[in-house]
């Protein structure tokens, strides 16, 4: 094949490395404005890093030629080292095998069995917030949403409430995220005997013990529930007939657990942040949520709550939790007439693509009335694209469409004075440090 020698424009290594010390999503956005859809960033002694901002180029890497761009970049290897070799982080044949195992557990029909659990926990939060509203107590939304989605995920996974174990569950995840998000070029191995690494090791052992205890406990009553752990315990390899090993289950659960609650919890917190900045949308959201009968959740809610869905879509557009998707070029390629070297690191950025002025009018504006129908899967992909598209997308959307109407049926809110919300862009995009709101019952 003929290859072009045309080289994409981009910053020098010094400017690039300095930019990584600040707000990286906004830095990538500034690089897009300055250098265009394909940005080349040199790294001494290594193949270059490319930032892709155009939806077509991102689709090329994640979907059309996905086999040429495996998850073998250094960020993905860090994720695997921290969270195990489950379907979220595995590569190659191991990933294909585990993804095939886990896919049925996240299909719509299977998830319907969990609706009553999600409904119960959403209503429990409403009752808790009613008490706080009556007492005029502030609510810290970031931690509240993280705790709610953690509770939901663990009940869906294990039929088990983690409320008394939240710190033990969250602490190793927090330390792992800090390690994964260490900026280039600080290539610090997790196995180096640093105080942080030792702390992660011991905290991670605690989490593994919690998971192993749940697996051992549930082995005694296989088939008694319809949750994900029961699904994994009942699984038999279609060729060998062998069940999953405990280690394989542990690896899967270690990756699904943090990915499942951190992302959805952050999306809910971003929704409150955006509505707090644009309070003119709260009344319309309240009105729509109260117009629908307070019945058990079903997929029909997606059609009966269009403005609510628009608020969620806009939140995921502006603050996609998977804001950068990393791959490695296994072979030389060409993108937009630019040569892509073998071994190059490819960063596909939904954060910048969702703000691309060629596809989005007033891209920085929060507009729940946007028409997303023509953008789905092409210029809008908060859950990724291609074969590695987020396996938990259906569960995340069900949680969002259950929690948001439940809360805004009962409450309006205002944001209280506090520190300015910033973006924590390590691994997923989360608001930090906190967001305090004052609730008012309707």
Model-derived regions: residue spans:
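Cytochrome P450 heme-thiolate monooxygenase catalytic core
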Residues: 1-7, 71-76, 94, 110-266, ...
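Cytochrome P450 heme-thiolate "Cys pocket" and heme-binding signature region
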Residues: 97, 254, 259, 296-300, ...
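Cytochrome P450 fold signature focused on the C-terminal beta-domain
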Residues: 222-226, 286-305, 318-338, 353, ...
């Amino acid at each position: 094949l003929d290859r072009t020698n045309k080289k994409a424009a981009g910053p020098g290594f010094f400017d690039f490395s300095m930019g990584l010390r600040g707000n990286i999503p906004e830095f990538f956005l500034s690089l897009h404005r300055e250098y265009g859809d394909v940005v080349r960033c040199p790294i001494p002694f290594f193949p270059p890093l490319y930032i892709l901002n155009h939806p077509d180029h991102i689709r090329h890497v994640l979907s059309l030629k996905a086999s040429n761009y495996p998850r073998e970049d250094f960020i993905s290897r860090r994720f695997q080292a921290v969270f195990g070799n489950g379907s979220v982080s595995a590569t190659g044949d191991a990933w294909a095998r585990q993804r095939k195992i886990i896919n049925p557990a996240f299909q719509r029909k299977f998830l319907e069995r969990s609706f009553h659990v999600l409904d119960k926990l959403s209503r429990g939060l409403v009752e808790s917030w009613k008490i706080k509203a009556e007492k005029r107590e502030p609510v810290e939304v970031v931690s509240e949403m993280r705790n709610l989605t953690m509770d939901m995920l663990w009940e869906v996974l294990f039929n088990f409430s983690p409320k008394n174990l939240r710190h033990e569950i969250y602490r190793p995840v927090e330390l792992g995220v800090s390690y994964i998000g260490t900026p280039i070029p600080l290539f610090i191995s997790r196995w180096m005997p640093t105080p942080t690494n030792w702390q992660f090791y011991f905290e991670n052992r605690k989490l593994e013990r919690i998971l192993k205890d749940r697996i051992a406990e549930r082995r005694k009553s296989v088939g008694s529930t319809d949750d994900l752990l029961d699904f994994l315990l009942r699984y038999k390899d279609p060729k060998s007939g062998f069940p999953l090993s405990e280690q394989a289950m542990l690896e899967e659960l270690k990756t699904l657990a943090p990915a499942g609650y951190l992302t959805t919890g952050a999306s809910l917190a971003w929704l409150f942040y955006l509505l707090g900045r644009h309070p003119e949308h709260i009344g319309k959201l309240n009105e729509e949520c109260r117009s629908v009968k307070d019945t058990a959740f079903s997929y029909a809610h997606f059609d009966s709550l269009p403005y609510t869905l628009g608020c969620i879509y806009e939140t995921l557009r502006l603050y996609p939790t998977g804001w950068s998707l990393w791959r490695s070029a296994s072979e030389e390629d060409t993108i937009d007439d630019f040569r892509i070297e073998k071994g190059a690191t490819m960063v596909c950025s939904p954060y910048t693509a969702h703000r691309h002025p060629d596809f989005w009018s007033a891209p920085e504006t929060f507009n729940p009335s946007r028409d997303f129908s023509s953008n789905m899967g092409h210029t809008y992909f908060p859950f990724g694209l291609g074969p590695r598209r987020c396996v938990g997308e259906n569960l995340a959307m069900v949680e969002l469409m259950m929690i948001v109407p439940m809360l805004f049926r009962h409450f309006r809110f205002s944001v209280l004075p506090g520190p300015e919300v910033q973006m924590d862009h390590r691994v997923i995009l989360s608001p930090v440090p906190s967001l305090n709101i004052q609730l008012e019952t309707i």
